[in-house]
């Protein structure tokens, strides 16, 4: 069954222009169903986001999402979902990191990133260097661990009781 709304289309020459603008900080590209993902060197994520926003018109940071791949040396992936309102086009910028290495914060470009980075920190334990308020946002302040990591036990580390009667 086809849908009556237009499908997202590739922007003509966009990937090549991005490759030229990002240079050595661009590690890989992948396009699928009209959406392109760019894998970026961790230390270059702020500049890559600035280029996407200022040179290519991706004005809106829609989401920052984490993913955990325990089999990789840099097990965490941080995904930045950007939208160009003028072109009606989305892209994804991805960086990889390990537990010890912080990802540079993009709060200088989009202040709303502070909330999104806090969520990734809380659920995966990924630190963001330069985030002015990196504390838990979804779990209790005394919560132990990061619940969306693949090695987090399904029952948690501590039994919590919210009712004195139980």
Regions found by a protein language model. Give the residues of each.
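Terminal low-complexity/charged segments
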Residues: 1-166
